[in-house]
């Protein structure tokens, strides 16, 4: 399990960016506008997710156990939705920045393709006694719940372009 601050994700090769965190009812929204990057970030399929003029919008619902990250290109077209399964979300006491407790499992939505990623990481953490059986089971239950709510959960189906 890893504590993830919203301000830290997907900015490794980014030289200049603007970031805005706002509260929208019972969720925090983090908008990252990529101004200048040393090199574009692409996934193994070749899909570029981080480049100059792109946006990353993260919605962190405080009453749910996930974080939804949406990648948009320079035309504000949605490239991918990436859902991190978490054991809980909150506000970091030291930095006052929203965070989620990442529990390895991710759900990735590209066009009409949906798949669960990093099951192997969850299995490895369980086998190496890095997480308990209870945590392992909870992560799988949360993941299955998210999968069943993909078309109805207000945070997942939200058109994030309204935050840009």
PLM regions with names:
Residues 11-19, 64-68, 102-104:
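Short small/polar-residue motifs
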Residues 1-55:
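Charge-rich, low-complexity N-terminal segments
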Residues 75-129:
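Conserved, surface-exposed functional patches that form binding/active-site neighborhoods
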Residues 40-95:
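The feature represents the first ordered module of a protein
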Residues 26, 64, 112-113:
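Beta-strand-connecting loop/turn residues
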Residues 138-164:
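Charged phosphate-binding loop/patch that engages nucleotide di/tri-phosphates or the phosphate backbone
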Residues 121-146:
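Short, surface-exposed, low-complexity cationic segments
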């Amino acid at each position: 399990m890893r504590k993830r601050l919203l301000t830290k994700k997907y900015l490794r090769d980014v030289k200049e960016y603007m970031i805005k965190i706002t509260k929208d009812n019972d969720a925090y929204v983090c908008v990252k506008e990529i101004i200048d990057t040393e090199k574009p970030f692409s996934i193994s399929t070749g899909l570029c997710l981080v480049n100059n003029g792109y946006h990353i919008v993260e919605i962190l619902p405080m009453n749910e156990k996930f974080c939804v990250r949406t990648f948009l290109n320079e035309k504000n077209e949605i490239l991918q939705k990436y859902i991190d399964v978490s054991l809980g979300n909150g506000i970091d006491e030291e930095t006052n920045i929203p965070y989620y407790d990442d529990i390895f499992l991710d759900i990735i939505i590209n066009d009409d393709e949906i798949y669960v990623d990093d099951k192997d990481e969850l299995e490895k953490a369980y086998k190496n006694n890095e997480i308990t059986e209870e945590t392992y089971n909870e992560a799988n239950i949360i993941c299955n719940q998210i999968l069943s709510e993909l078309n109805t959960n207000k945070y997942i189906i939200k058109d994030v372009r309204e935050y840009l």
